[in-house]
């Protein structure tokens, strides 16, 4: 008769566990998928903050590292170099990067019509609520200088839609305006300090600047600047999509869930997002107001933005931001979104 001591029992259990682990098809706890996601500090990146803050990525076996960038073009450079895996940023730099050979795809949308033109001081009074090419000329004649409008670097969504509004909608002569490229935070500071006459800004900067200076006026909404204005998307490197398809699908599903939460509970969403955008220094009520502002329109479905993106891509070539155009549909991988909504 075989006698089982504590030592032999333990040895048997260890041996059994080792054998089971070696058997094909045995279920084992998978290691978390680690993804580094870049973002621009704007309200349109809120779904990412909610996914991370609510622990939805962790629940799906994904460990996130969030990396902040001051503009889309800078973030795209890091992505093309393999320094980040995914990115929440404007669609324009993603498309421009693809024309230069970067293997990056849009897998979901985040927001549209988020960019506005805001002005203050003498320039705001001079152009009024309906800016015209003549009002730009008159301001220059009266002050002896061109109006300075702050925006982000060439090739970014802010730069692209601003030029569309100025030169296509208002039909301003390019010699009658000075465009000043700068980072997001510097744009807000420069506008409030009077170093700029106007600027392209997004939420929550729109709400913050108007709270700090009620005389800040909106010259154009996102829809007026560029109808169905493409904005922030979720993009990923092809290598990451191939290596972690299930994790990416789960992440897109969580992104959609976050967009839905913003619509249902802007107050609760604001409290979560405040830990990322406000760094605890901004009142959640400010972010809640931003979620309800004219520059806040969240849309997760990438299919819906393709026509407007095609128009934007054609315009980027026209103004020299892109040397060539590519079939826009090729820049989108709809499979992850389509699988997530099934």
Mark where each language-model region is.
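Short, well-ordered beta-strand elements
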Residues: 30-42, 62-68, 146-151, 178-180
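Ligand-binding "clamshell"
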Residues: 31, 97-107, 167, 208-223, ...
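Short, polar/charged alpha-helical segment
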Residues: 41-68, 73-74, 160-168, 209, ...
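Pocket-flanking alpha-helical
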Residues: 47-52, 67-105, 115-119, 138, ...
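A bilobed periplasmic-binding-protein/Venus flytrap-type ligand-binding module shared by bacterial periplasmic
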Residues: 50-52, 116-126, 230-246
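A conserved helix-loop-strand patch within extracytoplasmic ligand-binding domains
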Residues: 103, 110-180, 185, 238
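Pocket-lining segment of extracytoplasmic ligand-binding domains
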Residues: 186-276
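Secondary-structure end/capping motifs
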Residues: 242-323
């Amino acid at each position: 008769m075989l006698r089982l001591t504590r030592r032999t029992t333990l040895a048997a259990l260890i041996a059994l566990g080792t054998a089971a682990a070696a058997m094909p098809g045995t279920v084992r706890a998978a290691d978390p998928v680690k993804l580094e996601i870049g973002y621009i500090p704007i309200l349109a990146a809120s779904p990412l903050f909610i996914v991370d803050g609510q622990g939805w990525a962790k629940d799906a076996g994904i460990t996130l590292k969030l990396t902040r960038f001051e503009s889309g073009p800078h973030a795209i450079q890091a992505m093309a170099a393999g320094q980040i895996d995914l990115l929440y940023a404007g669609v324009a730099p993603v498309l421009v990067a693809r024309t230069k050979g970067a293997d990056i795809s849009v897998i979901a949308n985040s927001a549209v019509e988020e960019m506005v033109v805001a002005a203050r001081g003498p320039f705001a009074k001079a152009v009024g609520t309906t800016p015209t090419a003549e009002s730009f000329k008159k301001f220059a004649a009266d002050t002896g200088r061109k109006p300075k409008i702050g925006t982000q670097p060439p090739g970014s969504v802010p730069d692209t839609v601003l030029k569309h509004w100025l030169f296509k909608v208002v039909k301003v002569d390019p010699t009658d305006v000075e465009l000043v490229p700068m980072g997001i935070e510097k744009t807000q500071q420069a506008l409030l300090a009077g170093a700029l006459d106007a600027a392209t800004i997004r939420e929550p900067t729109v709400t913050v600047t108007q709270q700090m200076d009620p005389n800040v006026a909106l010259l154009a909404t996102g829809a007026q600047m560029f109808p169905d204005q493409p904005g922030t998307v979720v993009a990923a490197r092809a290598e990451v999509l191939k290596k972690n398809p299930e994790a990416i699908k789960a992440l897109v599903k969580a992104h959609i869930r976050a967009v839905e939460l913003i619509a249902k509970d802007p107050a609760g969403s604001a409290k979560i997002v405040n830990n990322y955008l406000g760094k605890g220094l901004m009142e959640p009520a400010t972010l809640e107001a931003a979620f309800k502002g004219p520059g806040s329109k969240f849309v997760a479905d990438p299919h819906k933005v393709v026509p407007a993106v095609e128009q934007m891509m054609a315009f980027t070539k026209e103004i020299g931001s892109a040397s060539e155009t590519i079939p826009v549909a090729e820049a989108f991988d709809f499979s992850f979104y389509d699988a997530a909504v099934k």
